[in-house]
């Protein structure tokens, strides 16, 4: 294992950091050249004047959420890190012989290396300590289910894509969940706690108001509804993570003996966003799946017979078949359908219905009056939905006259949508189909900015990775155009995402 580094984000604490966290590290005989203190530019001189000479002082950004993201970008993926707040006095563990008291940790180095060993044995990336400094609540055990990892002390392997933040006051809850979803667990050492002056010193999170906390808690609950509940006490409000959350199921279809690399990454992305995955298959050889997928089989990855929903006839066009298949599945079972070339980058929105969309031509002979139109990449509908039943009926009626081609069945679905008030459930195209089909090749090229065609501006690679919750990879076009998706540049959009999930 590469030796770990110690990272300390600090803001307006130059006058206490040396007497708190730095002094603790000195007491543990930690070499200062492995310590990195992240500060804002305006305070660099103040920290430089008080910190030990060998200590690394890095100019970062303001705001703990943005600073965490900056730290993640500063180090390589997989770099072992020990993150410490700047106000830590000491670390304590439950006394094995007398469990009515705690004793100071004897060797920090030993604690860190033993924790990384435990992470490796559980195939996890994030570990933390018990969040309350009270022997009464400590337990002489470790857990790997969903439990809060407080940001004061974290031992982890850096994952750049998991260090991006959308929350400020709840950033450590967000971190806990992102690593939990990606790995299937987080390691918490329930016999060790932290002695620090949390929420009482100047600096740190400056604008911690009740109103802002309420707003973040509500937004967090909406985003991660299955994984948490809101708790209130006196004049405070907070989040409580659920140890055994109820997982949402995504359903897909695959006809064929093997899956391709795009589908492999897509299925992995669904699992690493914490979903159960049910794939209806015909002829798939599960033994040829990548080991990263096989470990989920019969746990969160299940397979069912696709022909129970609808029979696939030899020689039949696969696209119109799969379109009708999904309508029939949703009408019979209800739930969430997702295309097997749709990679998830974040959680799906919690709303009654989901209908994804794609860009339309805004110039040329095929110019559309609409800037986007509904598609069927991700769909969420209730069982026995009237609109779906009408769509199925129309498709089956027209198929008696002529065999459907390419997108015929999707067009009938779009026609039925217009008759209903479903527009409010449309997902803006950049959130799932940010790179249009006419630019699909650029997904697999070393580009950060994509070509504007047909007067449609395409968001940048960084924007999509930060803001979109899915990415349609246009697998059908890659096959027809013989795109080498495995050999594509690692810095391409697809290459970047593939590295994240593998």
Predicted regions and their residues:
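Short aromatic/hydrophobic "clamp" motif used to bind/position activated sugar donors
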Residues: 81, 335-337
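Active-site donor/metal-binding and catalytic loop motifs
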Residues: 185-242, 429-440, 471
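Short beta-strand/loop segment that forms part of the nucleotide-sugar
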Residues: 7-8, 22-47, 57-61, 276-284
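Active-site-proximal specificity loops/subdomain of glycosyltransferases
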Residues: 38-84, 89-104, 285-324
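Conserved catalytic core of nucleotide-sugar-dependent glycosyltransferases
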Residues: 91-174, 347-415
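Donor nucleotide-sugar recognition loop
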Residues: 161-195, 208, 343
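Glycosyltransferase-associated regions of secretory-pathway enzymes
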Residues: 184, 239-322, 340-502
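Short, well-formed alpha-helical segments that are part of the catalytic scaffolds
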Residues: 8-29, 43-49, 258-269
């Amino acid at each position: 294992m590469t030796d770990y580094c110690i990272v300390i984000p600090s803001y307006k604490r130059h006058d206490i950091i040396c007497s708190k966290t730095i002094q603790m590290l000195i007491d543990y005989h930690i070499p200062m050249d492995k310590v990195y203190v992240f500060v804002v530019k305006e305070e660099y001189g103040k920290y430089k004047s008080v910190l030990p000479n060998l200590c690394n002082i890095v100019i970062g950004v303001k705001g703990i959420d943005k600073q965490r993201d900056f730290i993640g970008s500063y180090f390589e993926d997989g770099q072992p890190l020990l993150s410490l707040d700047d106000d830590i006095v000491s670390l304590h563990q439950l006394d094995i012989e007398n469990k009515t008291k705690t004793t100071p940790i004897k060797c920090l180095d030993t604690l860190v290396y033993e924790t990384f060993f435990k992470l490796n044995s559980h195939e996890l990336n994030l570990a933390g300590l018990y969040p309350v400094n009270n022997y009464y609540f400590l337990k002489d055990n470790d857990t790997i289910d969903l439990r809060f990892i407080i940001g004061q002390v974290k031992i982890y392997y850096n994952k750049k894509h998991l260090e991006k933040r959308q929350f400020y006051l709840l950033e450590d809850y967000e971190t806990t969940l992102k690593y939990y979803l990606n790995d299937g667990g987080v390691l918490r050492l329930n016999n060790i706690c932290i002695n620090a002056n949390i929420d009482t010193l100047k600096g740190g999170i400056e604008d911690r108001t009740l109103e802002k906390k309420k707003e973040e808690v509500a937004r967090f609950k909406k985003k991660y509804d299955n994984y948490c509940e809101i708790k209130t006490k006196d004049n405070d409000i907070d989040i409580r993570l659920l140890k055994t959350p109820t997982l949402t199921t995504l359903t897909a279809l695959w006809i064929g003996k093997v899956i391709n690399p795009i589908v492999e990454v897509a299925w992995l992305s669904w699992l690493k966003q914490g979903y159960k995955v049910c794939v209806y298959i015909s002829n798939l050889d599960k033994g040829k799946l990548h080991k990263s997928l096989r470990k989920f089989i019969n746990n969160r990855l299940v397979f069912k017979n696709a022909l129970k929903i609808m029979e696939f006839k030899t020689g039949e066009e696969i696209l119109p078949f799969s379109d009708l298949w999904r309508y029939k599945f949703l009408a019979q079972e209800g739930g969430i359908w997702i295309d097997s070339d749709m990679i998830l980058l974040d959680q799906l929105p919690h709303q009654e219905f989901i209908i994804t969309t794609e860009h339309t031509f805004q110039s040329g002979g095929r110019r559309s009056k609409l800037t986007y139109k509904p598609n069927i990449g991700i769909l969420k509908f209730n069982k026995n939905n009237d609109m779906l039943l009408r769509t199925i009926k129309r498709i089956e009626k027209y198929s008696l006259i002529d065999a459907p081609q390419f997108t015929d069945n999707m067009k009938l679905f779009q026609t039925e949508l217009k008759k209903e008030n479903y527009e409010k459930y449309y997902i803006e195209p950049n959130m799932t189909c940010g790179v249009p089909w006419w630019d699909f090749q650029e997904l697999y090229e070393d580009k950060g900015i994509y070509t504007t065609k047909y007067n449609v501006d395409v968001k940048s690679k960084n924007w999509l990775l930060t803001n979109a919750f899915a990415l349609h990879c246009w697998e059908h076009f890659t096959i027809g155009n013989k795109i080498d998706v495995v050999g594509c540049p690692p810095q391409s959009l697809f290459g970047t995402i593939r590295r994240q999930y593998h």
